[in-house]
Amino acid sequence: MTEGSFGVDHVTVAGRLDHVSLNLAPGTIVAVVGGDGAGKSTLMRVLAGALLVDSGRVRIPGPDRVGFVPTGAGFYPDLTVAENLRFAATAYRLGEVRFRGRRDYVLGLTGLGDFTERLAADLSGGMRQKLALALGTLHEPELLVLDEPTTGVDPVSRVDLWRIIADAAAGGVHVVLATSYIDEAERAGHVLALHAGRRLLEGAPSELTTAIPGVVSERHRPEERSRAWRRGTRWHEWTPAGLSVPGDEVAEPDLEDAVIVAALQREAADR
């Protein structure tokens, strides 16, 4: 991915990120994946301008051109949907005419038009996240930063939230999101996997799956448990390049397999 307008170059945050680089492109959704403690939320806060780095370069627009939806927040629970939108409009200094146009647009996009007088605290989990996205995109930011935007919501709401995110990207917004759902990351145009604050692998999802070194096999019982992981009722097992592959069927790997294989390689290299 070539250097875009926004991103980070070799940024370090002591104990959390170690020389991480990421370029964002307009109209492209970039997904950042990784386990607990990988550094996903830290990177989102850096990109949102909410956290200073110890070293490296951060390339982001001014605060009024960034939309940030932190995990589990992004709205005021004691305000109604309408009041939340009005508060955000005031914070971003939107004129009345522009506010009304944007308000009507985001309410229509999120399906919250019939709930404007409901307290945010009384919304369902999925509706709260839609409100948070409405607030994050109300001012038409150039950069939209989303920290775990679909965590804890039902499958239908996840689909709706992705539709809203895709709408922002289609409008030319730079979109970056952290997610624990690998299947969601496969919908992105570009993926960065972090492990213990370091870059694990990066690229388009299809490129990452085809670039897995060695062979991923699907089997009922693994031959080498240190290189195997459960996928449903069966196991996937990675055989490094150059080693013979036992006679089970070869799996068609996906992004989850690519991330796991990269983590196994990193662990072996760090020993």
Segment roles from a protein language model:
Residues A48:
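Helix-to-loop junction immediately C-terminal to a conserved catalytic motif
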Residues R65, R231-R271:
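C-terminal coupling/interaction segments
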Residues R86, T90, V97-F115:
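Conserved ABC ATPase "signature" region
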Residues V33-G35:
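The feature captures the beta-strand-to-loop junction immediately N-terminal to the Walker
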Residues L144-E148:
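Catalytic Walker B motif of ABC-type/P-loop ATPase nucleotide-binding domains
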Residues D160-V176, S180-W238:
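ABC transporter nucleotide-binding domain
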